[in-house]
Amino acid sequence: MGATATGLGVTYWQAMFAEFLGTFFLMMVVMGVAVDKKAEPGFAGISIGMTVAAVIAVLGAFTGASINPARTFGPYLMDMVLGGQNLWAYFPIYLVGPILGAICAAFAYAYLAKDSGVCELPQPFNDE
């Protein structure tokens, strides 16, 4: 119960790509409204929440719209512990797709916003 699974007729690679895209869009919004120092305060919560709702509405029937490996890991683990259906063969869809989507979005946002003067991303710690 609550475990994510692909829809009928959705291939392994289609599902992984869908999870990639969903997480990519979510991460782009997070970067733009929550991480970017020049983002207008007060809109991050509603923007991120509406993006999650939109991704779920679009991807729900195809992949269950996990967009977070932990969202899939917990139900899969409990299914295994409680003797339910074994869905671990699908786990790479929900691990690789979202992680690659988030990484690509972070780099894409940094690249697209760096020269526009709009973006000021936090810098890593420098111990010098």
Q: For the regions a protein language model found, what residue spans apply to each?
A:
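Membrane-interface helix-loop junctions and terminal tails of multi-pass membrane proteins
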Residues: 1-128
